């Protein structure tokens, strides 16, 4: 048993690598999906209700009547989403998310890029977690069941809550990048001192 505990105790390096890869995979995959209408449609309630983002939409107040389920095609809803700038905003967000993934993956080559990716991966969940406050669809609606509203998260709310893990993981990869930058600076300083003497 002790052998396994020692083995597990040395898992922090591999764990950090897995956190970095996981963050990159999530941002890359979801970022690429932002170019597909069903994913763009699915973020409409979050963006339309957000005081930080609703200005990107032409008519955020009208979104409810144009919501669709994943896999469902309604031409009038698609036309409204197009006119609303839903797809333009989603495409821009997709570009940002793919850039975050690439920056996070760039860490072994350039720690500063990795640090920037970690910072961006940290700030993204700060915005998305605010949706728990601003988006009514984050909570189970009052449709007759006794369990609705706070603390009963809907599927959308549960999805948003998982961003707390992204937030924590981003702190870890930022700390790792910063530690490596400081170590590199320290090594450069000591090698400069040695060459001067």
From Swiss-Prot:
Gene name linked to the record: rclC
Spans through the membrane: 16-36, 86-106, 113-133
Upregulation: Induced by RclR in response to hypochlorous acid (HOCl).
Record organism: Escherichia coli (strain K12)
Designated name of the protein: Inner membrane protein RclC
Cytoplasmic-facing ranges: 37-85, 134-197
Mutant phenotype after disruption: Mutants are more sensitive to HOCl treatment than wild-type cells.
Membrane topology: Multi-pass membrane protein
Keywords of the record: Cell inner membrane, Cell membrane, Membrane, Stress response, Transmembrane, Transmembrane helix
Cellular localisation: Cell inner membrane
The keyword Membrane belongs to this UniProt entry's keyword annotation: yes
């Amino acid at each position: 048993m002790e052998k396994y505990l020692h083995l597990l105790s040395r898992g922090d390096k591999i764990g950090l690598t897995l956190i970095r890869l996981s963050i990159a995979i999530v941002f890359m995959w979801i970022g690429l999906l932002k170019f597909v209408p069903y994913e763009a449609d699915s973020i409409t309630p979050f963006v339309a209700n957000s005081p930080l983002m609703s200005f990107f939409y032409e008519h955020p107040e009208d979104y409810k009547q144009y919501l669709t389920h994943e896999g469902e095609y309604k031409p009038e809803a698609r036309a409204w989403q197009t006119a609303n700038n839903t797809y333009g905003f989603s495409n821009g967000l997709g570009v940002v998310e793919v850039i975050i993934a690439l920056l996070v993956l760039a860490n072994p080559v350039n720690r500063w890029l990795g640090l920037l990716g970690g910072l961006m991966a940290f700030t993204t969940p700060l915005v998305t977690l605010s949706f728990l406050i601003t988006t009514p669809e984050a909570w189970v609606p009052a449709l007759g069941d006794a369990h609705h509203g706070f603390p009963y998260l809907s599927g959308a709310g549960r999805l948003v809550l998982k961003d707390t893990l992204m937030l924590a993981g981003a702190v870890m990869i930022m700390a790792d990048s910063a530690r490596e930058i400081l170590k590199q600076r320290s090594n450069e300083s000591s090698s400069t001192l040695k060459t001067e003497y």
